[in-house]
Amino acid sequence: MLDLLKISVTGDPSSGKTEACQVFEDLGAYVISADKVSHSFLVPYTSVGQRIIDLLGPEIIIENTLSRKAIAEKVFGNRDLLLSLEEILHPEVCRFVEEKYAHVVQEQKYPLFIAEFPLLYEIQYADWFDQVILISADTGIRKERFLKKTGGSDTSFDLRCARFSSLEEKILRADVVIENNGTKEEFRRKVKQCFKALKGTI
């Protein structure tokens, strides 16, 4: 039996990664989100949580959890703190994803294993995957989506984007690039076509 194909979906903020992963999941793929995994570590009573508290201070604890809003306020705009936080979280996230993959392979229920990894190239993790799908969208469109979804500011969008490497570089490295500058229906159709093509390689 061939190993289950490992595919990462990546892209800049508000490019459409989560929407693409939802389509893949609807079509039967196993989907895991690196962001959701990292959020699961944001509790004060774990070793990871304690390391984050030591880094950022006890004021990030709100209602017995580590506040993502408080963390974001501290690290976005402070590159050193952000990188230190990532050094704590990313190895744990990658370990969790790899363990989950091993379990999913044993289940033999899914045609594809999809992992949404926003900072895939930035943390040098692309080589673990068999293929990388990059979701691409123009900056202005992404900013509009971000502001509409989060109610945040232009500055908060720019700070989040600052951590990401250049889109041009990622386009050259990705196995598949799906553009998302049009309607949701157009984008979902492209993702479905991609799913069919990927299944054909199994």
Curated annotation (Swiss-Prot):
Pfam family for this entry, one: CoaE
Q: Which UniProt keywords apply?
A: ATP-binding, Coenzyme A biosynthesis, Cytoplasm, Kinase, Nucleotide-binding, Transferase
Q: Where in the cell is it found?
A: Cytoplasm
| InterPro entries xref list | Depp_CoAkinase (IPR001977), P-loop_NTPase (IPR027417)
Reactions that this protein is recorded to catalyse? 3'-dephospho-CoA + ATP = ADP + CoA + H(+)
Name of the top EC class for this enzyme: transferase
Which terms in the Gene Ontology molecular function aspect does this entry carry? ATP binding; dephospho-CoA kinase activity
Q: Can you name this protein?
A: Dephospho-CoA kinase
**Does the record's keyword annotation contain ATP-binding?**
yes
Q: Which residues bind ATP?
A: 14-19
Q: What GO terms describe the biological role, i.e. biological process, of this protein?
A: coenzyme A biosynthetic process
- Provide the primary localization: cytoplasm
> Start and end of every DPCK domain?
6-202
Please spell out the taxonomic lineage of the organism that makes this protein.
Answer: Bacteria, Pseudomonadati, Chlamydiota, Chlamydiia, Chlamydiales
Q: Which PANTHER family match?
A: BIFUNCTIONAL COENZYME A SYNTHASE-RELATED, DEPHOSPHO-COA KINASE-RELATED
Write down the EC number.
Answer: 2.7.1.24
Species name for this entry? Answer: Chlamydia trachomatis serovar D (strain ATCC VR-885 / DSM 19411 / UW-3/Cx)
Gene for this protein?
A: coaE
